[in-house]
Every structure is written in structure tokens, then in C-alpha cells.
Amino acid sequence: ASLATEWAALPDNPNVWRFKLRQDVTYHDGAAFDSEDVVFSLNRAMADGSDMKELLSSVKEVRAVDAHTVDIETHGANPLLVNNLTNMFMVDKGWAEANDVMTPHDVAKGETNFATMNTNGTGAFKLVSRSIDEKTVLTANPNYWGKGIYPSQVTEIIYTPIQSSATRVAALLSGEVDIIQDVPVQDLGRVGSTAGLKVGTAAQNRVIFFGVDNADGPTADLRVRQAMNIAINRE
């Protein structure tokens, strides 16, 4: 988070966004983070086979202005660009070259590469080990640039995938795990009333669209659709 400290569309060209990068940021292996990595990472995300390609479909070109300034030019003004970039993760170009992961692998085809099991980020936690569908272990990054901004007492994180929601809840209640997401609706009361546990909730800013078949069945009748609309409690 916050690898860019400033960003804005250029006053004379709304199709170009300029990003100022945070300085003195290093990857987990000690390599410096700079604009070359941003250009590489976004071009990699736009490559064929990338799951992130659609989010950057409006991008025409990514250019390094200097070591800590990047321009992103789009095909026409795109006010959603900054929001879409929050889903992008930076990859150290040198690390990618050294480990032959310059291009993304095709997850849909079951392909794997070095980056499937390894990573070299800039964040608060660095990867210790990863076993797909079993366990991923992270440890605190002692050189994290944001330690003074985002203080944390957590030194280790262990992710344990549990497919069954009932099993996840049981693991939480027994103390096998410390946190789960999301708590099934039917278990909110039981979890919330258990000593030492707390259910966290927050409002979401999103739209859920319900489409109805207006060509066949009961909803083909305009009156039914109007009744459904009236029945919604908008309060």
C-alpha cells in the first residue's frame, strides 16, 4: 500500500496520469523499488494470459519519467484507473529476470512457475513457505518501509485454507485458528457470544445487480416486476 505518494491527471492531458513513487522502499531481498519495476509490473499484468489484463484494458502506455516518477497514458480519460491500480502488485524486474517469471503463467490451464510458490514484495510480511491448499507462512519484514506509519505487533501469519464453512467455524471456536473470513450468517450469534471472539462488521460500497427474465415465466408480467420493486425495503 502507498507505494505512490502523489498522483493526478496532467492538467494539459487528462489521458495521462502521473504518479510519484515513495523513495527508500526495498523489496524483501533488499533490492530497491523504482519506476522501472512499475513499468515492468504493469506491462506484465497487461500481457496475454494475465488475469489482471482486463483491469488495465484502458492503458495505452506506461513510461518511466525518472527513477521515482511514472506516467500512465490511457485510451481516453479514465477516472477509474487509480481504483483499478489498487489491485496491482509490484514485481521486482531483476527478481523476475533471475527466476524466469517475466511473463504470467496461465492459472486456468493449471500452469505453475517460480512465482507460484515464491514472491519478493515490499510489504509488511514476507513469505517463509507455501504449500498449495495446505498452508502459507509469512513473517514480519524487519525492513518494511511503513513500520512507523502502520505499527503492528504481529510477527507471524499462517494461512490455512479450509473449504468447509462449518469446519472453519469449528476451528475458530476450538482455538485452532485465530480468525476466519467470512463468518457464515447462521453462526454469527454463536461466534459473537463466545468469550475471546469478536465479529467485525463494516458497510460495503458496492452494487449487487438482480436481473429478472422479462420474456418468460411470472416475471414476464410487468405487474409482477413492479410488485417486486415495490416490495424492496429501501430503508
Residues covered by each model-derived region:
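Ligand-site clamp/hinge motif
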Residues: R22, N113, N143-R190, P218, ...
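N-terminal lobe/hinge region of extracytoplasmic solute-binding protein
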Residues: A1-D12, N43, N120
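Solvent-exposed coil/turn segments that connect beta secondary-structure elements
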Residues: D12-P14, R22-D24, V38, N43, ...
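Alpha-helical secondary-structure segments
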Residues: D34-S41, A67-E73, G123-A124, Q153-E156, ...
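Surface-exposed binding/hinge segments that line
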Residues: K20, E54-P104, S131
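Gly/Pro-rich hinge or "lid" segments in bacterial periplasmic/extracellular proteins
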Residues: F89-P151
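Ligand-binding "clamshell"
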Residues: L56-S57, G189-T201
